[in-house]
């Protein structure tokens, strides 16, 4: 390569006979020094050795030499046409950055020369703040220093991380962490083997299994407006349509209808926007730091620390709280950080999830993944969710593969880890940049790795977990069977005495008439008595909906909604100490449900009627037991009317109850539980 030949020539010039060359003018006039003779070095090998004890002057010379070599490489690359010219097997490495070697050498020498306070390499690169580019020796080649099992949580030689020019609260952990380049490896630092360059797919394969959609960059203000702009009268909006609006913002430029017709559950795609700020309001490096400082997040419960090296995935979670210095120390060692429930602490992300769950009628979960440069945190695997990968910062290369078998397509459970040898050709191989979106269906095998000098921060939104027909049938068939047992004597009759002798795995080769007769009888019983009715299906769907009410995030109450709900109510006391409420209903008061899916009306097996809701759910997954209120059977008609009328308002007098007092009583009870909203504020 150009880099190798240039380096050899320079090295030869430095190592000659150490005699000062005469100028072209025979010493009469001092010739201008050339770049190759500007640095007079006594012993280049000593200067290149990071363990050498150098004087101040020698350190300055080493910096000069390093700067010269780096400029030489940059000049050589600028003169090239951008392609790799592989002329030396010892310097070629397929898939690596062309500037990997000089950049790594520069980083190693800077780490050796810098004082301890700068050992974190917090300097910004290319004018961009917040890019953590340091790689510890534990992430370098085969001779790298091995990480010791006990991990210190103490601090030595720390300095704050800089983001947007501000020092964050957490210093990087330096105790027990080796300096970059200490291993002495000659190649670039690696936390895992770089993947081979992508191979071309068979004709038509990429089109049938994945697509890449490019969107022209829009103005940043217009992008934010699509998400943040609310209707003038938010108390009159339809929460399902609001969920569609947020999904449309997520998918742009793909239309929601197009998405469900052409991609949903069968085809992966990437949206490339060239707009790094498209999702930047949802999360950032600085937000994660603030989250760790302000809240108690525990390893394993809220935070996972993972690595994937040499084909092996490891979880390296310490015990206890995920304190910022510990998290960033592990991150600086090359570990990936996964935050399991960020919507608990980030209001903007929680709002996106809570609005989208109205559209999907299921929990919308979110995980955050922060990966250092040239790292992979997870082995190839597939998940049991429809995944929307939102790239917020940096870059990450994603490779998707077909489900291993037909039974893995639209899988019900996530897989174990796959070996690289088990994977075929990728159906999609793309690098996500900030502002890009990747969607893939459940059962799609995937893996992702960051690039040299590029970290990655992305959010994975997950929907439709355990939301398939089979989940409905699991609820439905026990209901059908239980009713059929009561109604059919044939199902309650005893089995023939010879059943065990003609049926079973050991009897599969049995072709007797008695065996065939028994098989036919069982099939007839199922066909005749286990066909579900519409009422049975309704009951089963209610059971699934109860599960959603238990899992769902609580709604975020907007200011215009707050003054119309119990959450904006304030009570006072009179002179005698009696509580005085600031609201009062009458038959002319107009009300509606707070959200389309805020409640579920369910008749239980014992005949009781309950309203399950998620108004008071916690931010953590299923933090509380299912929340419900019990009503009288005759009051269910009023709730059914409110459900069918949404998003429109009804007056209290329109409730199908026998008296005005009863109507006011029922509506007041629902409003006080946070389930209803009035058209006009009481104040």
Curated annotation (Swiss-Prot):
Residues 116-125, 179-189 have a biased composition (Low complexity). Residues 1-26, 85-94 have a biased composition (Polar residues). It is found in: Nucleus. GO terms for molecular function: 2-oxoglutarate-dependent dioxygenase activity; histone H3K36 demethylase activity; histone H3K36me/H3K36me2 demethylase activity; histone H3K4me/H3K4me2/H3K4me3 demethylase activity; iron ion binding. Keywords: Chromatin regulator, Dioxygenase, Iron, Metal-binding, Nucleus, Oxidoreductase, Phosphoprotein, Repressor, Transcription, Transcription regulation. Residues 341-480 form the JmjC domain. Residues 95-108 have a biased composition (Basic residues). The keyword Phosphoprotein applies. Binds 1 Fe(2+) ion per subunit. The modification Phosphothreonine is found at residue 158. Residues 54-65 have a biased composition (Basic and acidic residues). Its EC number is 1.14.11.-, 1.14.11.27. It catalyses: N(6),N(6)-dimethyl-L-lysyl(36)-[histone H3] + 2 2-oxoglutarate + 2 O2 = L-lysyl(36)-[histone H3] + 2 formaldehyde + 2 succinate + 2 CO2. Residues 1-162, 179-208 are annotated as: Disordered. GO terms for biological process: behavioral response to ethanol; circadian behavior; negative regulation of DNA-templated transcription. Its cofactor is Fe(2+). Fe cation binds at residues 381, 383, 446. The keyword Transcription applies. GO terms for cellular component: nucleolus; nucleus. Its main location: nucleus. The modification Phosphoserine is found at residues 152, 159. Belongs to the ROX family. NO66 subfamily. Oxygenase that can act as both a histone lysine demethylase and a ribosomal histidine hydroxylase. Specifically demethylates 'Lys-4' (H3K4me) and 'Lys-36' (H3K36me) of histone H3, thereby playing a central role in histone code. This is Bifunctional lysine-specific demethylase and histidyl-hydroxylase NO66. It comes from Drosophila yakuba (Fruit fly). The lineage of its organism: Eukaryota, Metazoa, Ecdysozoa, Arthropoda, Hexapoda.
């Amino acid at each position: 390569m150009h880099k190798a030949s240039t380096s050899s020539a320079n090295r030869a010039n430095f190592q000659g006979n150490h005699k000062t060359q005469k100028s072209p003018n025979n010493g009469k006039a001092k010739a201008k020094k050339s770049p190759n003779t500007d640095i007079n070095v006594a012993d280049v090998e000593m200067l290149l050795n990071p363990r050498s004890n150098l004087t101040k002057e020698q350190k300055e010379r080493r910096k000069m030499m390093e700067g010269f070599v780096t400029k030489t490489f940059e000049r050589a690359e600028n003169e090239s046409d951008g392609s790799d010219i592989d002329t030396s097997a010892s310097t070629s490495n397929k898939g690596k950055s062309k500037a990997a070697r000089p950049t790594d050498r520069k980083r190693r020498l800077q780490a050796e020369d810098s004082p301890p306070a700068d050992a974190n390499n917090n300097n910004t690169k290319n004018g961009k703040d917040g890019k953590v580019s340091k790689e510890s020796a534990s992430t370098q080649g085969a001779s790298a220093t091995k990480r010791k099992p006990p991990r210190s949580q103490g601090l030595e030689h720390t300095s704050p991380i800089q983001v947007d020019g501000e020092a964050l609260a957490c210093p990087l952990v330096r105790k027990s962490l080796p300096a970059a380049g200490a291993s002495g490896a000659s190649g670039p630092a690696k936390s895992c083997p770089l993947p081979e360059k992508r191979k071309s797919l068979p004709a038509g394969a990429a089109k049938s299994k994945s697509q890449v959609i490019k969107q022209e960059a829009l103005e940043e203000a217009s992008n934010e407006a699509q998400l943040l702009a609310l209707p003038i009268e938010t108390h009159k909006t339809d929460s399902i349509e609001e969920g569609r609006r947020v999904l449309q913002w997520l998918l742009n430029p793909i239309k929601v209808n197009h998405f469900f017709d052409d991609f949903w559950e069968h085809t992966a795609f990437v949206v490339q926007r060239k707009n790094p700020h498209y999702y930047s309001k949802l999360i950032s490096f600085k937000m994660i730091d603030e989250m760790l400082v302000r809240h108690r997040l525990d390893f394993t419960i809220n935070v996972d620390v993972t690595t994937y090296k040499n084909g092996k995935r490891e979880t390296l979670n310490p015990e206890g709280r995920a304190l910022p210095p510990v998290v960033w120390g592990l991150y600086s060692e090359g570990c990936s950080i996964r935050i399991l429930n960020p919507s608990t602490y980030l209001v903007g992300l929680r709002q996106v999830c809570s609005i989208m769950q109205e559209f999907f009628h299921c929990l919308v979960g979110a995980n955050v993944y922060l990966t250092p440069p040239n790292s992979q945190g997870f082995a190839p695997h597939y998940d049991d969710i429809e995944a929307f990968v939102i790239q917020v910062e940096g870059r990450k290369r994603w490779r998707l593969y077909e489900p291993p078998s037909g039974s893995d397509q639209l899988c019900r459970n996530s897989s174990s880890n796959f070996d690289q040898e088990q994977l075929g050709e990728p159906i999609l191989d793309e690098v996500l940049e900030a502002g890009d979106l990747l969607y893939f269906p459940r059962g799609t095998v995937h893996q992702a790795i960051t690039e040299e000098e590029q970290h990655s921060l992305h959010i994975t939104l997950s929907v439709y977990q355990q939301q398939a027909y089979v989940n409905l049938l699991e609820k439905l068939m026990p209901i059908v069977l239980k009713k059929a047992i009561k109604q059919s004597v044939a199902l309650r009759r005893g089995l023939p005495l010879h059943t065990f002798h003609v049926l079973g795995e050991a009897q599969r080769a049995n072709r007797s008439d008695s065996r065939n007769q028994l098989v036919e009888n069982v099939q007839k019983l199922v066909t005749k008595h286990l066909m579900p009715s519409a009422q049975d299906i309704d009951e089963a769907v209610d059971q699934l909906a109860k599960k959603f009410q238990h899992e769902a995030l609580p709604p975020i109450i907007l200011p215009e909604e707050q003054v119309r709900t119990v959450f904006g109510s304030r009570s006072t006391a009179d002179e005698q100490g009696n509580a005085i409420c600031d609201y009062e209903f009458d038959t002319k008061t107009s009300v509606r449900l707070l959200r389309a899916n805020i409640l579920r009306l369910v008749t239980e097996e014992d005949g009781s009627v309950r309203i399950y809701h998620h108004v008071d759910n916690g931010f953590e997954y299923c933090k509380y037991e299912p929340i419900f209120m019990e009503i009288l059977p005759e009051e269910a008609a009023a709730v059914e009317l409110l459900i069918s009328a949404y998003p429109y308002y009804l007056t209290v007098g329109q409730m199908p109850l026998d008296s005005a007092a009863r109507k006011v009583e029922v509506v007041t009870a629902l409003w006080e539980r946070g389930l209803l909203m009035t058209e006009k504020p009481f104040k």
